[in-house]
């Protein structure tokens, strides 16, 4: 454990950010899995709506630096192919 006051604060902030980032990533993954589940059940109407939500969450995660922008683009592209197939 850190002894210096500023190091204690940084450790606390780091833990808070880690928890927040984990929450956002989990929400993002859930949205992607929802789209994939709807596509596999041939519910394309709801899949298109879920794709919009998942796309927004992927973009936001990329903007915040949680995932790389190219990774977000790649995931969105693959989801779009599945939804439009």
Curated annotation (Swiss-Prot):
Record protein name field: Small ribosomal subunit protein bS20
General function of this protein: Binds directly to 16S ribosomal RNA.
Any one GO CC term of the record: small ribosomal subunit
Superkingdom of origin: Bacteria
Family stated for the protein in its record: Belongs to the bacterial ribosomal protein bS20 family.
Alphabetical keyword list: Ribonucleoprotein, Ribosomal protein, RNA-binding, rRNA-binding
Any GO molecular function: small ribosomal subunit rRNA binding
Matching Pfam families: Ribosomal_S20p
GO biological process: translation
Taxon lineage: Bacteria, Bacillati, Bacillota, Bacilli, Bacillales
Region (Disordered): 1-22
Record organism: Bacillus cytotoxicus (strain DSM 22905 / CIP 110041 / 391-98 / NVH 391-98)
């Amino acid at each position: 454990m850190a002894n210096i006051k500023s190091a204690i604060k940084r450790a606390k902030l780091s833990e808070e950010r880690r928890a927040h980032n984990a929450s956002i990533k989990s929400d993002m993954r859930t949205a992607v899995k929802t789209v994939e589940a709807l596509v596999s059940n041939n519910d394309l109407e709801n899949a298109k709506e879920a794709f919009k939500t998942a796309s927004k969450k992927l973009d936001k995660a990329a903007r915040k630096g949680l995932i790389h922008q190219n990774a977000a683009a790649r995931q969105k592209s693959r989801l779009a192919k599945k939804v439009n197939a």
